[in-house]
A protein has these predicted regions:
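Alpha-helix boundary recognition
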Residues: 32, 66-69, 87
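Short amphipathic alpha-helical segments
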Residues: 15-39, 73-81
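Short, well-ordered beta-strand segments in beta-rich or mixed alpha/beta enzyme
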Residues: 2-9, 39-71
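Residue-level signal for secondary-structure boundary sites
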Residues: 15-17, 63-65, 101
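Short amphipathic alpha-helical leader/targeting segments
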Residues: 21, 54, 69-71, 79, ...
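Glycine-rich beta-strand-turn "strand-cap" elements at beta-sheet edges
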Residues: 41-51, 77-102
Length: 102
């Protein structure tokens, strides 16, 4: 069963570019080489003075998620330096089983 992993974080507007760059240079390389990684997307929106980012990744199965995230697969994986670009972030992710895709 394919797993969808959802995480959210928020930055000040002036740090939005740095937040995206942090994802592209720090987290994306780790995820993209992890066994069982299928793909990911990052999106953003303005939410009243902050920019919210949502990262959605897809994984082959729960074993792949655990290999990436460790023994607590619902715990967020936040590379060093994340605290420098985000105002706040979710410490936990939401995990879903993908039932169908187009």
């Amino acid at each position: 069963m394919t797993i969808l992993r959802e995480w959210r974080g928020r930055s000040k507007p002036e740090k939005a570019d740095a937040t995206l760059n942090h994802y592209l240079t720090k987290l994306k390389p780790i995820m993209s080489t992890a066994p069982g990684f299928i793909g990911a997307s990052i999106s953003s929106r303005d939410i009243g003075g902050l920019v919210e980012f949502i990262l959605i990744s897809r994984w082959r199965d729960m074993d792949a998620v655990k290999a990436f995230a460790g023994h607590a697969p619902e715990k967020a994986v936040l590379p060093e330096g994340t605290e420098n670009v985000l105002e706040d972030s979710d410490n936990f992710v939401r995990l879903f089983e993908i039932l169908d895709e187009v």
